[in-house]
């Protein structure tokens, strides 16, 4: 498995899956860089799974308070988790968040490389703990295009197991202008894959999104005929220093769809997917066509 730092196994934790708690609010897992946890009041628990460096407990796995907490940073990789959570919270303010940190930090404050092996380990934890925390969606923005949708062994099985429990794994297609392939893990058949639309135009200036304009698939967005949905990728996102910043990218669209999925969650994965498809409209560019979901900002 190749390593990456971009937008973009641990087989078992030795415990049996607990019984579901129907009275708990929905929780979304955000597999990402970690966050300065003091920024958010809706964090349910925290997890750290690292390939390089160590979690706060000195090991490569940690669960509980402080596990996903990271220092304030302006590094684009290390701000990413904060940005994703801010979008999910904007779409569904009532959601609970479980950040899973998969990116280590060097002594100089830079990110270590990481791979989909870390994503797989994070998914392992979700499978075991889904019922305990009432996890209903998993947001993944990391990845890379690999031949034949290569992923670590057991990843597809984890995603299928979560789908069977009415848990959506929602992943970004990537920003490589690839019109035939998506990031792994977005390319897996049981993943809800999300590409980006750009509206009102393809620049990166912080212009307000226009819901009356025709949504157009962004030129930078990866996608193909199997891409589940496209959504607006133009967002003002929270930064670790508490300020906001205008950003574009399939990660933003993915986080928005994650929040929207939880807002509209039905009794089964398929029913929710079908509902999102029913409220979508066609979108396209000169290379791709797909289903666009309007998500109010």
Predicted regions located by residue number:
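Boundary at the C-terminal end of the N-terminal hydrophobic targeting segment
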Residues: 16, 20-22
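Solvent-exposed loop/turn segments at secondary-structure junctions
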Residues: 33-37, 103-107, 143-147, 175-179, ...
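Extracellular S/T/G-rich loop segment that most often corresponds to the catalytic His/Ser-adjacent loop
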Residues: 26, 32, 183-266
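C-terminal subdomain of the subtilisin-like protease fold in secreted/lumenal serine endopeptidases
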Residues: 133-142, 153, 165, 193, ...
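Active-site core segment of subtilase-fold serine proteases
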Residues: 23-98, 104-106, 121, 125-134, ...
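Bacterial N-terminal signal peptides
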Residues: 3-12
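Gly/Ser-rich catalytic serine loop of serine hydrolases
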Residues: 73-82, 174, 244-257
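Mature extracellular/periplasmic domains of secretome proteins
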Residues: 23, 86-90, 111-139, 150-170, ...
